[in-house]
Amino acid sequence: VNRTVVGKIPTRYRGGRCRAGAAIALAGVVTFAGARSAHATLYTLKSPTDVVVGQDKSVVTVYEDTLYDLARKFSLGSEELIRVNPGIDPWLPGAGKTLVVPDSHILPPGPHEGIVVNLPEHRLYYYPKPKRGGPIQVITYPVSIGKMDWRTPLGLTHVIGKQKNPVWYPPESVRKEHAEAGDPLPPSVPSGPDNPLGLFAMRLAAGNGTYLIHGTNNPIAVGLAVTHGCIRMYPDDVAALFPLIPVGTPVRLINEPIKVAWVDGELLLEAHPPVDAQGQSFEPDIDQFAERLRAAVGETTVAIHWDYAREVLEKADGVLATVALEADDPNAPLPATPPASPGDAPRDPGTAAPAPSAPSGAGR
């Protein structure tokens, strides 16, 4: 890999523009009260090669707000919003506080079809089947994933059934766990406010049909690793998604804590806390991250700010950041020589111009 380390280029991404040195670039400031219902956004890709959707924004709190309410309003997991607003009390943020609302995403790798769930991101992407000749569209929602030994399986599966007002039949292993914790469960839990499946459920082929995408009776926990291997959504989100999903829809469950993308000569990095086989977060592997970044760079000549890239990885707040810029290749062929102006000394077109001197710190 041909790369050069340069001085500081830390940036945060803003929907197609980057601003050097900015802590974060925000689009608009919204004052909001009474957050209750989630609102996912339908993004239309201008090109099949588009890799980034959305734009970060900010919100000014009023007295009644909590970060849990605002997370639900802006279709974020509660932990996702808390992580990018350190030092803010999630239950009592107070009035007049300006909060970051992270709403830009690098699309997961792979085909733009069906449902994709990225476990470290705690986020679901749905690509509706486009009309003939129509553009690719994507809707995204926050989700909870499995924890401990209730592992959410990875790989390709599909929806094999759908049910409104589902009855929950706790598996024997789950009933045993609850009994040992002093919270015994009945053999079945009818549909209603106490049903942890919520009002809508979609059954996956994975695990012999034991895994579901479903609602919840505990919205605060959306965005966390709290479920018994299933994928939990906000009640309003699953109600909106449910009628869009036909039986047979492909579902890909992936584990991609690091997403990278080239946009207009800038290498964007989106980092989330890695998760282990049981869905639990752990410290990032810096060496693994460096290899992933090198793979993204390939043979492109770039200027990478490694210190800032590692800082973004360690923070793992999911906010897009520019960590490298495409650089001019000093070995590239010269452009055609323009016509000589009167008085110009003749020049041999085959003579290369002097190579530019390397920036301070090059090669380290």
What are these model-predicted stretches?
Residues 64, 94-99, 248-251:
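Loop/turn positions that initiate beta-strands
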